[in-house]
Amino acid sequence: MSEKSRRKHSEHEWLNKISDSLTLGAISYICFAFILGTLIIGVNVERGGVLSDWGAVFLAEVTLIAGVIHFYINHPRSFSRNGRVVLIFGLMFIHLMLISLVFSFVEGDIFGEGGERYGFLLCPLAFAPFSVSILLGRAQALFVTVLCSIWGSLLVSIDLSVPLLATNLIVGFVCVLLTDSVRKRSGLVRAGFIIGLIMLIFGLLFGFVTGSAPGEGVMDWKQFSLGCVVAILGGVVTVSVVGAILPFIENFFRITTDISWIELADLNHPLLRKMTIEAPGTYHHSLIVANLAEAAAETIGANAI
């Protein structure tokens, strides 16, 4: 074995030890529990959440423990891989931080008294569910959706906690459904538009678009138009940001998504075009075998990609 091969082999062994270390896994969960508690108690003091400061922290930590147990039982492979743990809980932390930052921004002088309404419409509720669904699959995205919905409701005031909880759950579930139909990165914009529409519908139901619930008061068309734009734009921007950071996450965590596989299968790919010229027989034979494999996978319900 050459020196280069030995160095590469030892590097892989070192990475595997880190990835499978129970000690590092436990440290990751403890760090997230501490960060989560700090984030919630800090925000709860400012905004007057639905529970007392320590009550909110207690609820967050209990749901975290329940979530970790669920994660261990239903996703043992991801649970035992520290890279996946860091990815999932890191995305959830970013999701919660974005919610907190959005409400901190809209509570300033720019938006005035209507800040909370725009904060609700601008919330990137699709961030973690959409990211995890594309990267790791639907089952783990549902897990993330439920936890982010509960924790997100603890970051806002009493008036917003239930609307945000309900909306986050529905948006997350829709994200899980939409990712199955997203085959190219360009399809992310369409998914973002659909998510924006859902945000708009819930904004109308809870009175965050017009400032009053349906049937209450006079319709303010200016507020309605602005609310529609904010809701749709929020959904499109959130999903577009997810699409922009996906290649970096895939590269860093060594994950290949369905979108990446489909892009590699593009017949205009330079390697495939070169193959059609230099080895046309092999090229056509490969296409036939690939089509047969895809049909077989679809027949047994496996992932054809």
Across the structure, where does each feature detected by a protein language model lie?
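Alpha-helical transmembrane segments of polytopic membrane proteins
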Residues: 51-62, 115-122, 164-165, 226-236
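Active-site-adjacent structural elements in folded domains
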Residues: 112-116, 275-276
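Acidic/His-rich, divalent-metal-binding segments that scaffold phosphate/diphosphate chemistry
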Residues: 143-147, 165, 188-206, 210, ...
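Alpha-helix N-cap/helix-initiation motif
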Residues: 117-121, 159-163, 167, 278, ...
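Membrane-embedded alpha-helical signal segments
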Residues: 1-90, 132, 277-300, 305
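Short helix-perturbing small/polar motifs within transmembrane alpha-helices
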Residues: 19-24, 35-42, 63-112, 129-139, ...
